[in-house]
Amino acid sequence: MRPLKLTMSAFGPYAGRMELDFETLGSSGLYLITGDTGAGKTTIFDAISFALFGEASGGNREPGMLRSKYADPTTPTEVTLTFRYAGKEYTITRNPEYQRPKGRGAGMTRQAANATLLLPEGDPVTKPKEVNMAIRELLGIDREQFAQVAMIAQGDFLSCCWRTPRTGRRFSGICSTPTSMWSFRTGSADRPTR
């Protein structure tokens, strides 16, 4: 699975709309996301994981915590991820449950959690549970497995490099090819760098 584009709206520390185009990073398939503490690195992982599985990348963040506390109340909270898998392109859009202003009158109302998966062929999958099942069937893994094989969390890079065959060395080529790595630097610039 290769991420192509990630769009976040009122998600985590991002009050507005933030778009990351992974295609600008090349086709090596290994991306390094760097930035200062609090710049939003983990939020990128959370957004990808939430789009795919309806859960943040870390077990301590509930979907209700994903709405930006800095967002305007009228800005919708959602994540859209376009990715390529087995040569086909998929787009998934998902929003957590959150409070938003009522359409009529004063006060707030609950925005229900929603998910839509656009398939390369055929009708879209439109209910969160059905999208979850479709993603699991497509990728063959759940969120926990995805977090272990597709994303190396902050602080876990060295432990992945030092794994032995006995402990399950899954990332054997990562430490040996640093020149093939591209990165997103999070923060004020938010531009891809090589």
Regions found by a protein language model. Name each.
Residues 1-133, 137-139, 143-145:
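Extreme N-terminal "head/tail" segments of very large remodeling/mechanoenzyme assemblies
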Residues 32-36, 50, 116, 126, ...:
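Extended, Lys/Glu-rich alpha-helical coiled-coil stalks
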